[in-house]
């Protein structure tokens, strides 16, 4: 069976001419598409550097048990012999992918990008002498390739002599040679393009078609290559056993710490002076301990996007950033507006911004143009030399000087989110009813429905580093690799509205009239906390706010002392940590989420008196306020899944940093502003760098182990939720995540086995 699509185009002049285009969409094409879809299921998407998202390197193998997936992949990746022809194919493929996918680093844009990768290759390959070596027969063959990539794949499979029953395996192998570039294309087609058509369309069908054409030219006997004998999996089994031993030891230690807290009577405390809601990020845990010790403060844990699926356009930015988990699609567009002390300040800022933008554009054009970089160096060499000297010898002073110059040229101004629904521009803003609904859901999910403090601070987080392509990996994963302060500011602004509070009161959430909500941001590199004022129209409790600022500075100092022990520094804690955030040669500004091990869903009282060593994601939850399990359902299917992605990324980047990580930062090259390569031509690296998980070349800092999820709730509620969601059954029964329930009534620990039975942990 086959179908034909015929398009008839009639000339506008009087000539009776007709151009007919025939595109044959036959069974072969559909079969090729189906095969590509099947092999793509095992590919892990690779996010770009600007929104570097943690992802399980073996995400496509989660239908297997953890052990099976690791054994299969470790065995396949180890012991691959060097193949010169394969390396040549890879080199050409990297060249074409880098040119097509570039987003601004290259001087000249690849022609025909708007028609797709395969189409562009089809038109340009005959001019690539490095590929065809000026062979007339190869050039002729290239010029006569079919226009549909599926047809090109069929042609190449036949030319390479791949048997029908082995074609899918061959395509799988084709993708596996450059999983980074293929994974990035998968991200474009399956994640980025969810919101609309891509300007430069590309798919894995294009990728495979181009690669097979190159393979036909450079490695025609590829299908005849003997498969290497699989290595004995004994080493991998020993690796898995070591992981299990670490998991058992850690679970025993953690449950031993929690056990005494279960028997304590948790009396509801008097009204706190301030409540601070932090992201569940493991880096928040030690800081929460520090601030709680300094005053009558209460802290809670909640996903750092604060329940708001928004896209935000910064006031001074040109791009719109999705500030929510990648599992969600943004529902609302939010813009920022300036709040200047007077018209003169705003005018000064705008003129300074325009001047800086002009300088930046000129500099970028001179830097990336193929004919001007040397002239740029000659003209600015002395100033660049001075800058390099200051940045290298005194990074803190250089940062302060740069900040002062920026303030002189373009003085900073306060901004606030514009979130009211714009009747003239309906794509911007959130309706009142939706503001109320999202505010209520956020408060219920974080367990903050009564006993409000006088000050409630929603504290997002971000990092501050220099010369760091992986900067977004240190920002908030729940905000899509962006900083979370603006989400915090937005929720605070909504909850400060009287009309929203009245509606919440009708739904049983009574917020005292003297309670004020503030947005804030925790810098995880330096531990500084900035509290925003633009969302507050009245200033009361100034004494509490001043004391809180003082205590936050002390908490910063205390947490710096705790963190410096892991950074192997002999300098003053605060001085060294400040240097790390400003030093452009620093390969490890902070440890990020290294050593993450557990995800605890429970009231803060259960963990408040325990030093969890910055290894636990903490999500506030009170099962007594969630009889139907709806809140727990959201927590397990959203924040916990994100935590599992983070955990597995750190795990696999540690056990094999070459295969699953990105190697040393020292030899990184940024490719097309989308990712990094090792050297000048490698696969697009898709995991964490060596310095993020290893304290030395041969000693890991991160302890590779699967995520341990601990839920303080009755087993029957948890079991119902697991049965309801395939993603939970996959993670728990295939043992990608371990689940322990703490019975609130008997205080016994239960482990969910892969057989879907609960066993008591003694």
From Swiss-Prot:
Organism placement in taxonomy: Bacteria, Pseudomonadati, Pseudomonadota, Gammaproteobacteria, Legionellales
PANTHER family hit by this protein: INORGANIC CARBON TRANSPORTER SUBUNIT DABA-RELATED, UPF0753 PROTEIN AQ_863
GO cellular component, one term: plasma membrane
Cofactor(s), names only, from the UniProt record: Zn(2+)
Sites where the protein binds Zn(2+): 279, 281, 461, 476
MF GO annotations: zinc ion binding
Subunit and interaction comment: Forms a complex with DabB.
Functional summary from the UniProt entry: Part of an energy-coupled inorganic carbon pump.
Domain of life: Bacteria
Similarity-based family: Belongs to the inorganic carbon transporter (TC 9.A.2) DabA family.
Statement: the UniProt record of this protein carries the keyword Membrane: yes
Species of origin: Legionella pneumophila (strain Paris)
Pfam families: DabA
Name this polypeptide is given: Probable inorganic carbon transporter subunit DabA
Localization per record: Cell inner membrane
Alphabetical UniProt keywords: Cell inner membrane, Cell membrane, Membrane, Metal-binding, Transport, Zinc
InterPro entries: DabA
Topology in membrane: Peripheral membrane protein
